[in-house]
Amino acid sequence: MQEIENLHQSVLLQEVLQAFTPLEEGVLVDCTLGLGGHSKALLSQKPHLKLIGIDKDKFAQEIAKERLKAFEGRYNLLSGGFAKRFKEALEIHGDRIKGVLVDLGVSSLQLDDDNRGFNFHSHALDMRMDLESDLNAQKVINSYPVIALEKIFRDYGEIKEYKKIAHKIAERRAKKPFKDAKDLSDFLSSFSKNKKIHPATLVFQAVRIEVNSELEELKEFLQCARNLNGAILCVISFHSLEDGLVKNAFKDYAKNCICDPLSFQCTCSNNHALGAILTKKPITPSPEEIKNNRRSRSAKMRVFQFKP
């Protein structure tokens, strides 16, 4: 267990604790429990807080359960997609939910496990958060039509040469299907000219998002979160697609006027804001945190306070 403590560094931990400073009691929902780092710190700091932890990865959840042993009776852990499980929690606990945390990053345990397919040297081509899911990265890369690959590379990877990459993958798999993540990574490196980032980075991002329906789940969650009352919502994202969805949702939550934009005059009473955005600009890791945990470098945290 000490090895896990050393391996896993929760991103923006102090900033998360700061965001939830007003919370003293009630229920906090950690929608992406992972290895339980944020949850453990919050339960330690707030003795009257109850926690609901959600995660697709049952293996990670078992580790989190062990780490949270000292808080037995103060938490419940749920398996499954966080959008669906959060909706269920909100239906049951309602206004008792005082805080919601979403950390959209992949855990170090998943990234470093060569059997999971998240890193460039993996012996698998998987990328599933939920190991019971049918769709994995191998199916996407080896069997998706070229037009579908183009779409996910364009929309989820924001890759400029999405057509070229999709066609090259199709040409290669016709001769020899990709067997693992290293095979795919090496192939992409053989013809990519991008020197700023690893040639496989954006392709892996796009495939991972497709395999886990990450953006669809985030959209569903953000829609459901509108029903929170008096709660603090804290979301940590790791790429522009996620951050854009969160930023726009928070702006929408904070709108006073909900009239048609084509209207010349407000007729809605101009008091429909669900709360206030607490972060004018996203909070990012300090240089010291990035130095200690390079994987935190792209993290952005936004916080919203819902009205009671």
UniProtKB/Swiss-Prot annotation:
Broad class of the protein's primary localization: cytoplasm
Keywords assigned: Cytoplasm, Methyltransferase, rRNA processing, S-adenosyl-L-methionine, Transferase
BP-aspect Gene Ontology terms: rRNA base methylation
Enzyme class: transferase
Pfam families: Methyltransf_5 (PF01795)
Classification via InterPro entries: RsmH, SAM-dep_MeTrfase_MraW_recog, SAM-dependent_MTases_sf
Domain of life: Bacteria
Catalytic activity: cytidine(1402) in 16S rRNA + S-adenosyl-L-methionine = N(4)-methylcytidine(1402) in 16S rRNA + S-adenosyl-L-homocysteine + H(+)
Residues involved in S-adenosyl-L-methionine binding: 36-38, 55, 86, 103, 110
GO cellular component: a single term: cytoplasm
E.C. designation(s): 2.1.1.199
Reported function: Specifically methylates the N4 position of cytidine in position 1402 (C1402) of 16S rRNA.
Protein name per Swiss-Prot or TrEMBL: Ribosomal RNA small subunit methyltransferase H
Origin species: Helicobacter pylori (strain G27)
This protein's encoding gene: rsmH
